[in-house]
């Protein structure tokens, strides 16, 4: 029978790597607690219509990349390709964003897109999402950016990432700009790359995001979106930049930054790095003030961002910013298999009384010699021996594995005090 293998584009997190995730997740929680954001947990399956109405039917994600299927009732369902739409659905369904209410939320979990797998891009990938609802002013824009900046500083990578900013204006601004862009591109139709030609009919703004050099040269003299944005929104964007200057957050303006999701309005941003090759974006977000209303809720201001956790881990690893793994246990018990009913009770009592200790043993209970070999391999500092003689005398044997000392004895009723020292 052939050996089963993992699905292409999916990854196992092996025991030797799980500590990296635990480290990153602990830093994420530390920062989000600092800003008083509440964790929420969302289903990985949503109705397909949710993403059609939010991400956009013409977007690359919905048109090319979603995992869609019908359940046994014939309902069209989708493995979530991103988290914002599901979070908005939850907020609406549970009346968390009615007028006057505010919410500051975060979540972390797997997303699914059928893309060509490569370093930093997978078909199942983990994403941290941070979302805020009901805040109209600039202050929330700055706070959301500051959260990402604080996380990068906490991880020691702030000097290796760059914040890029743009404003998409209102939906009317974008409609007017789209017409001007199409008019400009008409003479260049035959010279555009294949993807850009497809986007002319479906999502022309995405052409600005093309990485093809020839297309970029064509766009060099194209109309600028900023020239079509209302005065008030342009002033708000300018003020946002001024506040970031005051906060000491480095950034650069990127007039071609448009984001690949249809729901964004106003401010959009990305954090990029030059350390990961083509997968340079590690964080992206912006305002999506119309999405709650578009999905059946009230008209509520909203902003958020997402961080690709695998890409962030790759960056941390490449820069040597991950801590060394410490798999060593603290205490290794060496037990007599004939007396397990007594010795295991002692071990379990110590585990309950001293939960901070990592305690292990050889569950095959071989000879004492073989158990000592496993104790040495475990990296434990101390081996505690409980055999028939120890039980008869009321004393456990103590062997310091990393020191050249004689074996000691400690009374069973003093073991906890001994291990606390």
UniProtKB/Swiss-Prot annotation:
- Keyword Ligase included in the entry's annotation: yes
Q: Which CDD domains match?
A: HisRS-like_core
Q: Which GO terms describe its cellular component?
A: cytoplasm
Q: What class of enzyme is it?
A: ligase
For this protein, what reaction is catalysed?
tRNA(His) + L-histidine + ATP = L-histidyl-tRNA(His) + AMP + diphosphate + H(+)
- UniProt KW keywords: Aminoacyl-tRNA synthetase, ATP-binding, Cytoplasm, Ligase, Nucleotide-binding, Protein biosynthesis
The domain of life is: Bacteria
Is Ubl conjugation among this UniProt entry's keywords? no
InterPro entries for this protein:
aa-tRNA-synth_II (IPR006195), aa-tRNA-synth_II/BPL/LPL (IPR045864), Anticodon-bd (IPR004154), Anticodon-bd_dom_sf (IPR036621), His-tRNA-ligase (IPR015807), HisRS-like_core (IPR041715), HisRS/HisZ (IPR004516)
| Bridged cysteine pairs (disulfide) | none
User: Which Pfam family, an example, fits this chain?
Assistant: tRNA-synt_His
Entry EC number(s)? 6.1.1.21
Gene Ontology molecular functions:
ATP binding; histidine-tRNA ligase activity
Subcellular localization is given as: Cytoplasm
State the Gene Ontology BP annotations. histidyl-tRNA aminoacylation
Assembly with partners or alone: Homodimer.
Entry's family note: Belongs to the class-II aminoacyl-tRNA synthetase family.
According to UniProt, the name of this protein is Histidine--tRNA ligase
């Amino acid at each position: 029978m052939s050996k089963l293998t993992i699905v292409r584009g999916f990854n196992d997190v092996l025991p030797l790597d799980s500590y990296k995730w635990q480290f990153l997740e602990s830093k994420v929680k530390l920062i989000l607690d600092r800003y008083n954001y509440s964790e929420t947990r969302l289903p990985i399956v949503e109705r397909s219509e949710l993403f059609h109405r939010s991400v956009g039917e013409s977007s690359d994600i919905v048109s090319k990349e979603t995992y869609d299927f019908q359940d046994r009732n014939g309902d069209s369902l989708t493995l979530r390709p991103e988290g914002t739409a599901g979070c908005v659905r939850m907020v609406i369904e549970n009346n968390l964003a009615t007028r006057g209410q505010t919410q500051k939320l975060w979540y972390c979990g797997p997303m699914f897109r059928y893309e060509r797998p490569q370093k930093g891009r997978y078909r199942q990938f983990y994403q941290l999402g941070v979302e805020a609802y009901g805040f109209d002013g600039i202050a929330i824009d700055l706070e959301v950016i500051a959260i990402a900046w604080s996380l990068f500083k906490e991880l020691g990578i702030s000097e290796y990432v760059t914040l890029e900013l743009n404003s998409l204006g209102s939906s009317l601004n974008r409609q007017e700009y789209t017409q001007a862009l199409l008019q400009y591109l008409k003479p260049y139709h035959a010279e555009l790359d294949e993807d850009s030609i497809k986007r002319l009919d479906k999502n022309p703004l995405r052409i600005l995001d093309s990485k093809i050099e020839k297309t970029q040269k064509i766009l060099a003299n194209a109309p600028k979106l900023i020239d079509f944005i209302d005065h008030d929104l342009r002033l708000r964007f300018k003020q946002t930049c001024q506040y970031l200057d005051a906060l000491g957050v480095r950034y650069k303006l990127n007039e071609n930054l448009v984001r690949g999701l249809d729901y964004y309005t106003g401010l959009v941003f990305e954090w990029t790095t030059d350390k990961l090759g083509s997968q340079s974006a590690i964080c992206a977000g912006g305002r999506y003030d119309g999405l709650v209303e578009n999905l059946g809720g009230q008209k509520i201001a909203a902003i958020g961002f997402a961080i690709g956790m695998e890409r962030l881990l790759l960056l941390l690893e490449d820069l040597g910013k991950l801590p060394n793994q410490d798999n060593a246990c603290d205490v290794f018990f060496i037990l007599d298999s004939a007396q397990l009913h007594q010795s295991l009770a002692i071990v379990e009592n110590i585990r309950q009384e001293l939960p901070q200790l990592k305690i292990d043993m050889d569950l095959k209970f071989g000879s004492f010699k073989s158990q000592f070999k496993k104790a040495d391999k475990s990296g434990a500092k101390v081996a505690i021996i409980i055999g028939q003689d120890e039980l008869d005398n009321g004393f456990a044997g103590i062997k310091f594995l990393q020191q050249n000392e004689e074996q000691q004895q400690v009374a069973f009723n003093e073991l906890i005090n001994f291990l606390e020292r």
